[in-house]
Amino acid sequence: MRVNTSKAFSVLAAIVILIAVAAAQSKHCTPAGGMLITNLGAVDAATTMGVATGDLKGAVGATILSTEGTGNTLILHVQHHWVTESGDTLDFAPATATTTQVAPGLYAMVTYPVHLKGGTGKFAGATGDITNIGEVDLNTGRVVTRYVGQICYAGGEN
């Protein structure tokens, strides 16, 4: 009987430890939002550079990898480059922005989902999904975007 009690206690202790480890490794999610203001053509014709405000405040850029379009629709395949004010980097998956022309050279962002797949510092192991709205002015090279979404930090940190 004493052996069975010891085994039961050992199994219970192992379960408690596993639950504690799992809880420590769980992600803590918080909302994120702000604005991006960039200039297209800052480096070359396909690259923007600018600033991010809000929860992910810092410097931001994007490279247009390719485009496709039919009628008034212009689709941009984009790779983002982002460094927060504290020096952490954000690693985003390539994104697709679907826009529609609202005036000559002026495009409204219809859908623009972006997926965070990690980064450095507090963003190491973080994930998140962000949606964007805004405008691209190909006449002046100005891009303005409003972003909103959720960031889930690894280990419950943020």
Regions found by a protein language model. Give the residues of each.
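Bacterial N-terminal signal peptides that target proteins for export
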Residues: 2-11
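Glycine-centered signal
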Residues: 3, 19-23
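Beta-strand-enriched cores of mature, soluble protein domains
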Residues: 25-158
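Bacterial N-terminal signal peptides
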Residues: 10-20
